[in-house]
């Protein structure tokens, strides 16, 4: 295996997160106390008369919206993510409490024949408490799945790519967006699953650690190195990594003492494979042009946006989007933070006009910092790409 050829180094953006630790707890506490008061007000209004249930719900929604704006705006860094975090508290914590409470109030009113004052015609529909209970339970179930189950429900996704440039199958495992602030049992399980796949190549697509402070980052870097060394991962043709949004200058030291080789430039593997590793900036703008070759041409970048520019390659691999982290039926990912099409960002293998195949991994981690830590209908994944000889 030849050492990577150097390419002109592009200044990487500094990770805005490392070393910055805003205190968001007071704003979270204040917001939740506000919504708790809104919960009580909605139940109290409905208790006066079933006719007030709809206005109470509207006032609750308005109060939550204004609360998200007021408290979310207090955090300057990653403000949109923090607003989403507050909204998730309202929807998945207070939502079930409020709707189940409304179901109880409406059921009691139905048994009593209406409001406590016995106002004529104020008896709720017999379906109202059932609908409120069903909605509350639905929100609770979605919340449990999104916050407690899916984030660690690791999936192995296998994609087969035919190519005339290989004479025998080549197994590539792509690890994207580990993006953790604490190396623990889940991260060690991910590494064990990689080792079990016995890959020919291991490619890492950026975003490895997302910690609040330099001290936390240093501690978790050592933990990641220990976990990698203990994992038994030994790709036959090597392991290569590129930087992502969470990495700052000097990120290459993350893999010191491990089998993983940071790559910005070109590596020729076993004379049959050319891997082009992109800097973060290049993964946004496009891959630099390279001379023609008969080798299998792989381009590895963090963001998939480089696929929008022409690239002389057979296989384009990226991460960054997390598959959206939240997907809805018939809609797909709600947010991708990328300029590529939603289906690309969601991970669907795409044959580009150039003949290259683009595959974006949903990643194994999730957004940290002030963002809500959830996945919904978008399980974390290890991507296993089998490049096989194409039929003659």
Residues covered by each model-derived region:
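Binuclear metal-dependent hydrolase catalytic cores centered on His/Asp/Glu-rich metal-binding motifs
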Residues: 250, 254-259, 264-308, 371-379
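Non-catalytic terminal accessory segments
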Residues: 1-151
